[in-house]
Amino acid sequence: MEQLEVLGAEIAYYRTSEKDYISLTDIAKYKDKRTEQLIQNWLRNRMTIEYLGLWEKLYNSNFNYLEFEVFRNKAGLNSFLLSPTGWVNKTNAIGIITKRGRYGGTFAHKDIAFEFAS
């Protein structure tokens, strides 16, 4: 795992199969200490779900479209909750990865991480 500095913040990233994954957790720390809630709130947004679904459609032949439709229909509702792990486990997503442990957190493909940061 490597680090880069952006606006004075250390952001972890790593490469796998020539794909760059950037820590959403570290990006979120720049905005708020409650990183988990920030990421989950971002995932609740309908536009985020639409973007993630399109990204997975382009790059993931094993994406579970049926579960994606369930999330898309619920996105934006006050009762809708979604964690990165829930997204990955139910849709077979490859754009977001969750890691546990010392160097853990939520990582996303650079395309998705840049969307999160914007």
What is the meaning of each model-derived region?
Residues 1-118:
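An anion-engaging/catalytic patch
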